[in-house]
Amino acid sequence: MPADDYPVTELTKALIARPSVTPLDEGCQTLMAERLSAIGFNIEPMVFEDTTNMWARRGNEGPVFCFAGHTDVVPTGDVSRWHTPPFVPTIIDGYLYGRGAADMKGSLAAMIIATERFVAKHPDHHGSIAFLITSDEEGPFINGTTRVIDTLEARNEKITWALVGEPSSTLKLGDVVKNGRRGSLTGNLTVKGIQGHVAYPHLADNPIHKAAPFLAELSQMHWDNGNEFFPPTSFQIANINGGTGASNVIPGALDVMFNFRYSTEVSADILIERVEALLKAHELDYDISWIFNGLPFLTGDGPLLDATRIAIRQVTGYETDPQTTGGTSDGRFIAPTGAKVLELGPVNATIHKVNECVKVDDLEQLALCYEVILEQLLC
């Protein structure tokens, strides 16, 4: 069968054609639900404010294997820079172009096709298969996966293994899987001063001058050495804003936003304690608030990682490399429940860019990998 005609290709195209920019779903989950319902899944829509979520499950017993993903996509950017319209899926030279092709409608289609094939071969499979799908992964992540997990936890419905379809691969399909992620902690700091005329500094108090030594020391601090699974904790200043825009006014306040990506060697509480101790040491007048974006998690050797290694080896012929690098994903909301979480998806070279694309052959290989993982865990 030509790659253009693979069922996974056709389903990916159907999903791309729905312009589901966060928090819109545009019928993607309805399309998925129709396919899953036809093979015995119970479909449970969970709509929270502007976000569409779906919990679908086949089976009532454990263990529970869950495909997790998102139907929302990031904005297209300047449409004139795209080779083809971003929501008109187009195949050129073996690549399928369109917003969401790699992140992550290709993965969603591969999950559906793999599950259909698996259920057809193993209608009486062990345990349960579930889908946790949201339209709020690329946005504020308030009413998406985290709300679904809260609902499941409230009724003691547990996920044993979760496979997130984030585009984990770097150079070729399956060369990298994410078996963990660093924690993410954001600080919003306001350093207070006294506004005044630059010609009369003795009548003002410049918060930029006051904060500069603190920020210099903070940016040079050593947080930890990392470990065999995680690189050392990193600190980055993301935004600094101060002043009125005029050259003759000393500002009354300085706003700084910064972020930690931290390993399992430290906790958010330790990072907060060290930052606030340094603020006090510099005798700054300040307000600070903290946003917890996710705890670090790690899935070590065990059934899920073993099954994924076997699947990638069997389908591609090479070994995968488990890593914890990169940004956060919705896996950070699933892992605290005790579930083992992995991420496996297409090559990520074009995600969030203009001309986002995925290799058509990779979509079929990804579906095959997902199917083998199901067989390894539920047969």
Curated annotation (Swiss-Prot):
GO terms for biological process: diaminopimelate biosynthetic process; L-arginine biosynthetic process; lysine biosynthetic process via diaminopimelate. Zn(2+) 2 binds at residues 103, 138, 352. Pathway: Amino-acid biosynthesis; L-lysine biosynthesis via DAP pathway; LL-2,6-diaminopimelate from (S)-tetrahydrodipicolinate (succinylase route): step 3/3. Its EC number is 3.5.1.18. It catalyses: N-succinyl-(2S,6S)-2,6-diaminopimelate + H2O = (2S,6S)-2,6-diaminopimelate + succinate. Keywords: Amino-acid biosynthesis, Cobalt, Diaminopimelate biosynthesis, Hydrolase, Lysine biosynthesis, Metal-binding, Zinc. Gene3D superfamilies: Zn peptidases. Zn(2+) 1 binds at residues 70, 103, 166. Its cofactor is Zn(2+); Co(2+). InterPro entries: ArgE/DapE_CS, Bact_exopeptidase_dim_dom, DapE_proteobac, Peptidase_M20, Peptidase_M20_dimer, Peptidase_M20A. One of its GO terms (molecular function) is zinc ion binding. Signal peptide: none annotated. Pfam families: M20_dimer, Peptidase_M20. The keyword Oxidoreductase does not apply. The active site is at residues 72, 137. Binds 2 Zn(2+) or Co(2+) ions per subunit. Homodimer. Belongs to the peptidase M20A family. DapE subfamily. HAMAP family: DapE. Catalyzes the hydrolysis of N-succinyl-L,L-diaminopimelic acid (SDAP), forming succinate and LL-2,6-diaminopimelate (DAP), an intermediate involved in the bacterial biosynthesis of lysine and meso-diaminopimelic acid, an essential component of bacterial cell walls. This is Succinyl-diaminopimelate desuccinylase. It comes from Shewanella baltica (strain OS195). The gene is dapE.
